[in-house]
């Protein structure tokens, strides 16, 4: 999953990977729904955290 992305992603890359807007990606990080690291003034998301978010989101979908 997400093989074409680096091991540590920017918020912009996360938005692209999830096909959501940049504001929505920041909202996921700010609400702690998506684990992220602050490196200086930048926010970085380790790929395993993005994959975990997607797995968790899939399990929470109600049909």
Would you name each region that the model predicts?
Residues 18-44:
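Major-groove DNA-recognition helix of helix-turn-helix-type DNA-binding domains
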Residues 22, 47, 54:
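Short amphipathic alpha-helical/adjacent loop interface patches that line ligand
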Residues 14, 33, 58-60:
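Extended rod-forming repeat segments used as scaffolds/tethers
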Residues 50-63:
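A short, Lys/Arg-enriched interface patch at domain edges and termini
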Residues 1-24:
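Polyanion-binding surface elements
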Residues 41, 49-50:
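A generic "binding-loop/recognition-motif" signal
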């Amino acid at each position: 999953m997400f093989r074409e992305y680096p091991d540590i992603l920017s918020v912009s890359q996360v938005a692209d990977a999830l096909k959501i807007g940049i504001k929505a990606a920041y909202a996921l990080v700010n609400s702690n729904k998506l684990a992220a690291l602050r490196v200086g003034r930048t926010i970085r998301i380790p790929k395993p955290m993005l994959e975990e978010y997607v797995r968790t989101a899939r399990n929470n979908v109600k049909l």
